[in-house]
C-alpha cells in the first residue's frame, strides 16, 4: 500500500512547483508560436509530461471545466472525431486531426494556467512576432542571407523580395496585424504603464506596419484595416462619430503609404485586379484569387448533396476532385484545401458541425471576464480569426495554436497557491536560455 501511495501521490508542495513550471513553459510556448512549430511542439510535450507527473487529474480537470468555454472547444473536436467514422480518405482525415487536436489543449492549459501569467503569455507572443519581424528586416536589408542551414538542419528559408522567415507571407502578415491592433488598443486604454515600454510599443507598431508593406500577404492587410476600426470602436464606442473619423483617417493614411511606397503592396493590388479581369474576361480561374473562387464553388456543390452531416473529416478534397476532374482538372493539383473554413467545415461535418463551430466563436465573443481589457483582447483576436477564415485557414499549426493559447490565457480566472515574481532581467535571461534550448531541439528534430 505504501508503494502504491508513493506512485500515485505527489505532495501539494510539489504539485505547486510543477504548476509554476508549466506556466513558465507556456510563456516559452507562446513566444515560439510564430517562430518554430517543432520547437513549440517540444515545449508542449514537456508540459504534457509535467501534467501527467502532477497527477490528481480529477481535481485539476474540475478547475479547468469551471470555465464554460472549455466544453465548446472539446465539443468541436469531438464533431471532427465523429466525422472520422464516415470518411473514406483516412490519410487526409489523420492529417487534419493532427492539427485539430490543438482544440483540446485548453483542457490541459486551464488545469494549470494561473491568471497572473495571462499577460505575460500575451507579451511573449508579441515578442515572438517582434523577433520574426527583426529577422525579416535583416533579410530585407541583406544583412543576413534569405536561407540559413546548419548542415542538414534548416533554420529558416525565404526570399529577399518577400522576407517572411518562419511563416509563409499570409501567416506572417496576419500575426503582425493582430499584434499591431493589440498594441494600439493597449496604448489607447493606457494599459502599458512603463514609459519605455510605451515607446517600444509605438516603435514596434510603426516598424511592424512597414514590415507588412514588404510582405505579400493580402489577407493580413485586410485583417489590419478591419481591426483598426474594431479597436477604435472598442475604445470610443460611446462616440460613434469619433470612431468613424479616427478609424477612416488611420486606415486612409496606412493605405496611402502602402500604395505609394510599398512595391509589394502595389504588386499584390495589381495582381488582384489582373486575377479578377482574367476570371471575368477569360473565365480563367488558375490564379491566386481564381483558385479560391473556383475551390469555393466546388465546395458549395459538395455541400448541396451533404448539407446535414457532411462528407466526413477527410473527404472534402476527394469530393472536389470528383466534381472538377473533367472541367477543371488543375484545381486538385493547385490547392490542398477549399481556402474557406466556413465552407470547409460545412462540407466536412455538415450544418450540425458548422453550428457548433459558430456557437464556439459566439460564446467566446460574448464571454465576460472580470477585466474589460481581457474581454476586448478576446474580441480583437476572435474577430481577426473570423476574418482570415474567409480566404485562409484556421485548422493549422500556427493559427489554431495562436488562437487557443491566447484565448486560454485571457479567459483564465484561477489563482493557484504559487508565488509569481514580477518579470525581471534575470528571469528574462532564463526565458531566453530555455527558448534557445527548445529552438535547438526543434531545428534538429
Question: Where in this protein do the model-derived segments appear?
Answer:
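Alpha-helical transmembrane segments of multi-pass inner-membrane proteins
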Residues: 118-151, 167-237, 257-261, 367, ...
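Hydrophobic transmembrane alpha-helices and their immediate junctions
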Residues: 54, 233, 244, 348-385
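Transmembrane signal-anchor hairpin modules in multi-pass inner-membrane enzymes, especially those
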Residues: 1-88, 116-117, 123, 187-199, ...
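Loop-to-helix entry and N-terminal half of a specific, functionally important transmembrane alpha helix
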Residues: 21-29, 71, 204, 336, ...
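A membrane-periplasm/extracellular boundary helix in multi-pass inner-membrane enzymes
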Residues: 215, 235-282, 297-305, 313, ...
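Long extracytoplasmic/lumenal interhelical loops at the membrane interface
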Residues: 282-297, 301, 305, 309-349
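Transmembrane alpha-helices of multi-pass inner-membrane enzymes
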Residues: 46-51, 228, 360, 378-388, ...
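Transmembrane alpha-helical segments and their membrane-water interfaces
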Residues: 31, 51-61, 83-136, 169, ...
Amino acid at each position: 500500500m505504501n508503494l502504491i501511495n508513493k506512485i500515485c501521490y505527489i505532495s501539494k508542495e510539489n504539485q505547486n512547483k510543477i504548476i509554476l513550471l508549466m506556466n513558465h513553459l507556456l510563456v516559452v510556448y507562446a513566444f515560439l508560436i510564430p517562430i518554430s512549430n517543432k520547437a513549440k511542439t517540444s515545449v508542449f510535450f514537456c508540459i504534457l509530461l509535467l501534467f501527467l507527473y502532477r497527477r490528481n487529474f480529477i481535481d485539476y480537470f474540475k478547475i479547468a471545466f469551471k470555465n464554460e468555454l472549455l466544453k465548446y472547444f472539446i465539443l468541436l473536436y469531438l464533431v471532427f472525431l465523429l466525422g472520422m467514422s464516415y470518411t473514406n480518405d483516412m490519410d487526409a482525415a489523420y492529417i487534419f486531426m493532427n492539427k485539430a487536436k490543438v482544440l483540446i489543449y485548453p483542457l490541459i492549459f486551464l488545469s494549470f494556467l494561473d491568471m497572473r501569467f495571462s499577460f505575460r503569455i500575451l507579451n511573449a507572443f508579441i515578442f515572438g512576432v517582434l523577433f520574426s519581424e527583426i529577422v525579416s528586416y535583416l533579410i530585407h536589408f541583406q544583412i543576413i542571407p534569405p536561407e540559413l542551414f546548419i548542415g542538414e538542419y534548416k533554420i529558416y528559408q525565404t526570399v529577399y523580395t518577400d522576407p517572411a522567415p518562419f511563416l509563409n507571407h499570409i501567416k506572417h502578415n496576419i500575426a503582425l496585424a493582430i499584434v499591431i491592433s493589440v498594441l494600439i488598443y493597449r496604448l489607447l486604454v493606457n494599459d502599458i504603464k512603463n514609459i519605455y515600454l510605451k515607446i517600444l510599443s509605438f516603435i514596434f507598431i510603426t516598424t511592424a506596419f512597414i514590415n507588412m508593406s514588404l510582405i505579400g500577404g493580402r489577407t493580413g492587410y485586410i485583417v489590419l484595416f478591419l481591426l483598426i476600426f474594431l479597436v477604435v470602436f472598442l475604445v470610443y464606442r460611446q462616440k460613434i462619430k469619433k470612431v468613424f473619423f479616427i478609424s477612416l483617417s488611420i486606415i486612409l493614411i496606412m493605405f496611402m503609404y502602402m500604395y505609394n511606397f510599398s512595391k509589394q503592396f502595389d504588386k499584390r493590388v495589381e495582381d488582384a485586379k489582373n486575377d479578377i479581369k482574367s476570371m471575368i474576361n477569360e473565365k480563367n480561374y488558375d490564379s491566386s484569387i481564381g483558385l479560391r473562387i473556383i475551390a469555393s464553388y466546388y465546395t458549395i456543390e459538395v455541400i448541396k448533396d451533404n448539407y446535414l452531416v457532411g462528407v466526413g473529416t477527410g473527404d472534402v478534397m476527394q469530393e472536389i476532385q470528383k466534381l472538377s476532374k473533367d472541367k477543371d482538372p488543375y484545381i486538385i493539383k493547385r490547392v490542398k484545401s477549399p481556402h474557406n473554413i466556413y465552407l470547409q467545415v460545412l462540407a466536412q461535418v455538415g450544418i450540425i458541425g458548422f453550428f457548433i463551430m459558430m456557437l464556439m466563436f459566439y460564446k467566446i465573443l460574448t464571454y465576460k471576464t472580470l477585466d474589460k481589457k481581457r474581454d476586448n483582447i478576446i474580441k480583437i483576436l476572435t474577430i481577426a480569426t473570423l476574418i482570415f477564415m474567409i480566404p485562409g485557414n484556421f485548422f493549422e499549426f500556427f493559427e489554431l495554436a495562436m488562437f487557443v493559447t491566447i484565448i486560454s490565457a485571457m479567459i483564465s480566472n484561477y489563482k493557484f497557491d504559487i508565488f509569481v515574481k514580477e518579470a525581471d532581467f534575470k528571469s528574462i535571461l532564463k526565458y531566453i536560455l530555455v527558448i534557445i534550448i527548445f529552438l535547438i531541439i526543434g531545428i534538429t528534430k
